[in-house]
Amino acid sequence: MKTLYLECAMGAAGDMLTAALLELVNDKADFLKQINSIGIPGLKVNMESVVKCGISGTHIRVSIDDGIGESCADAAILKYIHKHNNLSLKHSHTSFEKIENIIARLSVSQKVKDNALSIYRLIAGAEASAHGISVEQIHFHELGNADAIADIVGVCILMESLAPQETIASPINVGSGFVQCAHGAIPVPSPATAYILQDIPIYSRNAHEELCTPTGAAIIKHFVKRFEQMPKMRVQKIGYGMGTKDFEYVNCLRTFLGETENSNDEINDRIVQLQCNLDDMTGEAVGFAINLLLQEGAMDVFTVPIQMKKNRPAVLLTCICNEYKAHFFAELILRHTTTFGIRRTICDRYALKRKTLTKQTLFGSIRIKTGEGYNIKKFKPEYDDIAEAAHLNNVSFSEVNDAVLCNKTNEEKKI
């Protein structure tokens, strides 16, 4: 299984993650060209080789016109206001709605936009909790800067390019002490970072500084499936993303890209099932909650008709998610449904090793989802690709589907 491992012994920040992932890709110039043309006026992203404690790595530098952007939490707020095609970045205060509008207009894939927005939702929820206000009232400070947006979008672009089947991270070193932000000096980890990192293993060691920023924490929480020591894997590439500050220990986030193997005789996955009974919500309200949970990255959400006390017709809402995200989804369910309690069940799951192939057909490119394991091989064309191809070519769904199934490449036949 293609696996990405993040070693967070010196924490995590957006620029460190971008640099560490960039070292894993073959065409670095192509990424720089892409990130510099996403549609943020005046944005310039450069990579530079640096050496810390005798180890060579990459540092990402972001500039906006004449100002140099900093991705760490204590960055100075840039004073420039950029306007282009109705896209405006006011660096001192940027609302979540404005962040949504900015990302929606960027020249990146929809998958990158969705991932970036999900990361910002994690940050917005954390900031709202820390300040005791609603998400709608949140005004980002440094995190609303164009350089912070570039960090988050850059990581999403690189993750789409690398396409790991599984992403694992070590426990995260958060640092200690206090850090200066727009509201004054706050403890490390910051309230927002601490909120995001709930249910994730963290520790403090080696530095009296902030090592994990809200941006770094949110990116990791969004993409990482498991938190543990490095698994048994055949490493193919290693990346070093260097931080700005110098410490006694090398200030870097290290990435490993390689292959891991699961024994077909063992259970290879663990998930959490969150459930509650609902008998006093409208269908529209339940549908809204389901869409929100799926939008935030739940693995699956569904309802089953049930009958409750006093013979009331009701639904059983089930949300399936990764174990480390259970607290996050439980809070969403409590906030957006009428339930007073949620049942949590930890489930071991048998899962096939998955990957995605792309097939060229008469109707365009179609992605094919494949699964292998337990002496079983399966493949299935992606519904969205077939539906879009059918619409664009004015043919039936079955015609496109048959074209994929009846003309498999040699690689697909082996699956």
UniProtKB/Swiss-Prot annotation:
Q: Coiled coil located at which positions?
A: none
- Asked whether the UniProt record includes Cell membrane among its keywords, one would answer no
Q: Which InterPro entries match?
A: Ni_insertion
What UniProt keywords apply to this chain's record, in alphabetical order?
Answer: Nickel
User: GTP-binding: is it a keyword of this entry?
Assistant: no
Q: Which Pfam families match?
A: Ni_insertion (PF01969)
Q: Per its UniProt record, what Gene3D superfamilies does this chain match? A: Transcriptional regulatory protein pf0864 domain like (3.30.70.1380)
Annotated signal peptide: none
- Which GO terms of the molecular function aspect are on file? lyase activity; nickel cation binding
- Which protein family is it in? Belongs to the LarC family.
Mind telling me what this protein is named?
A: Putative nickel insertion protein
Source organism of the structure? Endomicrobium trichonymphae
